Curated annotation (Swiss-Prot):
HAMAP family, sorted: His_tRNA_synth
EC identifiers of the protein: 6.1.1.21
SUPFAM superfamilies reported for this sequence: Class II aaRS ABD-related, Class II aaRS and biotin synthetases
Biological processes annotated in GO: histidyl-tRNA aminoacylation
The encoding gene: hisS
Major localization class: cytoplasm
Protein name: Histidine--tRNA ligase
């Protein structure tokens, strides 16, 4: 078969890289479940109507067609067609509505699954990738304290990954109500448009954002400057945040008795609570950063972006926020708050920038040698004895020369080679020699019994190193 060409944006990890990815997945799952989150998996496809509900553009959605239907897709409206999910929030909202009678609320769920997004591939950005999400969904209402809990859970999970070379992570938080109230206080009406342009600040810079605010959102130059001044505000505690925000409102004539300020103050109070409570539990893990906008229009409260120290070019590696209107059933709403890690992007950084790597490809600690094919059943019995005792074991694929079998083990990183007992050559009725096992790293070879032998725990363990 001819060698297939790679497809841009669809990564395939080598076995050693997959070990790193799996370790990241296992670590995240452990932390999520430690905090009471329940794992689910949803289907890969949703209706076009569901996918477009989140504000995503149709050009970013991969639609499905049977081969014989190619060329006739226009006969079916996009809302009725099936597409691959581009995130895990849309599937979650549909899942909650469909299964609400079987779920306990608030519903705390974790989900680690592939998603597909039709965007231009570039370094660290893929068209097929794994996301890791946590969300809490309420029935009717959802207490604000979850807006503190979720970013702290994510920080805890990312902190665990520092053992594999990940730098320290800091969550930058804002609140949509704060931003919206300020923009309305300035006299701006296209709040969603302003948020979308502010969300581009790190990518295109302040001058270009100011131009877009005036050209596409109807802002005057003074209003655009005020929006950028708000985006410059950061604070590490609630009192500092309130003082800076009130001073900015006063300088732009936003009265404290106005409806706009009242709305902004609601968001400010929630954001101050998040920063202060996070500081009491994990100092420095969450800061207020008023340029965080999250361009998707379904967020209604807190919004988050997460950055790694010394990795500015990577951008945000974990984002999310509060959404009150994404899922509903009749008159009943299911508000939620969630955060999502681009896991494939994170793994790519850990592999190529942080130097994370597996100490060996194979999970097996032992390779049982095979002297000849007639002895394979005996080799398999030894392997099964070791496996029954929890020792990961493989058997040599062929009865090749011993040197080739050892080279095979070395290529896979298997540290021990087991030599089954063999009858001494020559003398009739000679007693079989005993089993022996060799550490091919140190060269040490000792007599061994598969019912009692124990490998060195450090040597036997498949690990991720930096």
């Amino acid at each position: 078969m001819a060698k297939g060409a790679s497809i841009s944006g669809f990564p395939e990890w080598l076995p050693s890289e997959r070990v790193v990815e799996q370790r990241v997945i296992d670590t995240l799952r452990k932390v999520f479940e430690l905090n009471g989150f329940i794992g689910i998996e949803t289907r890969a496809v949703e209706t076009g109507a569901s996918l477009l509900k989140k504000g995503e553009t149709s050009k970013e959605i991969y639609l499905l067609s049977r081969l014989q239907e190619v060329g006739h897709e226009s006969d079916t409206p996009i809302e009725e067609r099936l597409g691959l999910h581009f995130d895990l929030t849309v599937p979650l909202s549909r899942y909650v509505v469909e299964h609400s009678g079987a779920l306990a609320f608030p519903f705390k769920r974790w989900q680690i699954q592939k998603v597909w997004r039709g965007e231009r591939p570039q370094e660290g950005r893929f068209r097929e990738f794994v996301q890791a999400d946590i969300d809490v969904i309420g029935a009717g209402d959802l207490p604000d304290h979850y807006e503190v809990e979720l970013p702290l859970v994510m920080v805890s999970a990312l902190e665990e990954l520092r053992a594999y070379g990940l730098p320290k992570a800091t969550v930058h938080a804002n609140n949509r109500k704060l931003s919206e109230g300020f923009y309305r206080g300035l006299g701006l009406t296209d709040v969603e448009g302003v948020l979308r342009e502010i969300d581009k600040l790190d990518k295109i810079g302040a001058d270009e954002v100011a131009r877009l605010l005036t050209e596409t959102c109807g802002a005057t130059e003074a209003q655009a400057r005020a929006c950028l001044e708000l985006a410059e505000l950061t604070a590490s505690d609630g009192a500092e945040l309130a003082a800076k925000f009130d001073a900015l409102c006063e300088s732009h004539g936003i009265a404290k008795d106005s409806e706009a300020y009242t709305l902004a103050r609601q968001g400010l109070d929630t954001l101050a609570m998040i920063v202060d409570e996070a500081a009491a539990i994990r100092p420095g893990s969450v800061i207020a950063d008023l340029k965080i906008a999250r361009g998707l229009d379904y967020y209604t409260g807190s919004v988050y972006e997460t950055f790694l120290d010394g990795a500015a070019s990577l951008g945000s590696i974990c984002s999310g926020g509060r959404y009150d209107n994404l899922a509903s059933q009749g008159n009943r709403k299911y508000p939620g708050v969630g955060l999502s890690i681009g896991l494939s992007r994170l793994v790519s950084y850990m592999l190529h920038a942080a130097g994370a790597h597996a100490n060996r490809v194979s999970p097996a600690a032992v390779l049982v040698a095979v002297w000849n094919e007639e002895d394979r059943p005996a080799a398999n019995r030894i392997a099964n004895q070791l496996r029954a005792r929890g020792i990961a074991t493989d058997v040599a694929p062929t009865a090749a020369k011993l040197g080739k079998q050892i080279k095979y083990a070395d290529k896979l990183g298997i540290p021990y080679v087991w030599f089954p007992a063999t009858a001494a050559e020559g003398a009739e009725g000679a007693e079989p020699a005993g089993d022996e096992v060799k550490n091919i790293v140190t060269g040490e070879q000792v007599a061994a019994d598969c019912t009692s032998w124990e490998p060195d725990t450090v040597v036997a363990q498949q690990t991720v190193e930096i």
